[in-house]
Amino acid sequence: MSKPLPLVTRQGDRIVIVNGLRTPFAKQATAYHGVPAVDLGKIVVSELLARSGISSELIDQLVFGQVVQMPEAPNIAREIVLGTGMSVHTDAYSVSRACATSFQAVANVAESIIAGSVDIAIAGGADSSSVLPIGVSKALARTLVDANKARSLSQKLKLFSRLRLRDLLPVAPAVAEYSTGLRMGDTAEQMAKTYGISREDQDALALRSHQLAAEAWQQGWLHDEVMTAYIPPYREAIIEDNNIRKDSILAQYAKLRPAFDRQHGSVTAANSTPLTDGAAAVLMMSESKAKALGLPPLGYLRSFAFSAIDVWQDMLLGPSYATPLALDRAGITLADLTLIDMHEAFAAQTLANLKMFASDTFAREKLGRSQAIGEVDMSKFNVLGGSIAYGHPFAATGARMITQTLNELRRRGGGLGLTTACAAGGLGAAMILEVE
């Protein structure tokens, strides 16, 4: 076990999250079809500033992430600053940690506040799976570079004459891991088989996610943290996430065919999170700065931890490695938590992590700990549904989870919450949040 590591400034100030906001999330090629991630980021940051009631001149820094990169706007953070009327002197840089990207943005801001280099900052992320960087083949790319160096038309024509018809076809973004060639769904299948996660249990978790998310919207619990989005030509308002199945039944899930292992698999489109568009952001500052501005804290960041594991086997077990570290650094145990929110990339991955939380064998053999952190009380787990229902704009999910958990803790009268996620590349993230 590691020692507690308080997240406080030299003056003893805690890290405050004052406000959080997101756009409604939308399935690929639906509500935000044609809207790039940078525009989604501008929308949410502009509205967050308006709702927070502070001058944009006070923002020292914006740290923002994007996983599906736009070649024409590689630093999405700076483009958001320039496109929202914020001061041109506001520092801005971009981060990427796959599905844990906005967790990283929040951690970076927290570290800057602790170091004293930043007083007030915004952290978040945005992604679009509808506006994708479509590439060209390696053969065509090399020919284009060589042609740019050619001195005559005949030299250029000679270069292009070597190309085959297939070299001219567009190349879609890769969905597999660069280092292994494995898709995340392949790893989810492997974990389902390794840890005995049945198709029935996966479908049941997916149904639960949709039912709880539908209830959250019906009860009005998400209205304050999800803005209304207006997209050109501004004829319709987007007010809710459009992936949530409000009236699905378990029998419908059983009808879907496996998506990755077609013959023997159990991971389907229904028990996986879909490709999604959206953006989310949080406003952060030191505790004394919030008091000076008269801004009540939504909550506090108690601790965070990141993990990295093997990518060939169990790549999506990041939460099982990062969570014990975050708990130790906060000086608490799993039993102290009021809420637990885990990113549902796949139902199989989620259920496998829950098993590892409770496994003494895993704790001893993989973590070097004498015992497991504990079995999760499902009455505390993903109480408003998860990513299977809401969707997963890669860089925005962490900020969604943080805001959602803080608001739900406040609605319940306070307490401690865990937000945790797996990420491509064998990465994991975990954060402990507190509401008084």
Curated annotation (Swiss-Prot):
InterPro entries: Ac-CoA_C-AcTrfase_FadI (IPR012806), Thiolase (IPR002155), Thiolase-like (IPR016039), Thiolase_acyl_enz_int_AS (IPR020615), Thiolase_AS (IPR020610), Thiolase_C (IPR020617), Thiolase_CS (IPR020613), Thiolase_N (IPR020616). The keyword Signal does not apply. It is found in: Cytoplasm. It catalyses: an acyl-CoA + acetyl-CoA = a 3-oxoacyl-CoA + CoA. The active site is at C99, H392, C422. Pathway: Lipid metabolism; fatty acid beta-oxidation. One of its GO terms (biological process) is fatty acid beta-oxidation. Its EC number is 2.3.1.16. Its main location: cytoplasm. The keyword Repeat does not apply. Gene3D superfamilies: 3.40.47.10. Signal peptide: none annotated. It comes from the Bacteria. One of its GO terms (cellular component) is cytosol. Keywords: Acyltransferase, Cytoplasm, Fatty acid metabolism, Lipid degradation, Lipid metabolism, Transferase. GO terms for molecular function: acetyl-CoA C-acyltransferase activity. Catalyzes the final step of fatty acid oxidation in which acetyl-CoA is released and the CoA ester of a fatty acid two carbons shorter is formed. Heterotetramer of two alpha chains (FadJ) and two beta chains (FadI). Belongs to the thiolase-like superfamily. Thiolase family. This is 3-ketoacyl-CoA thiolase. It comes from Yersinia pestis bv. Antiqua (strain Angola). The gene is fadI.
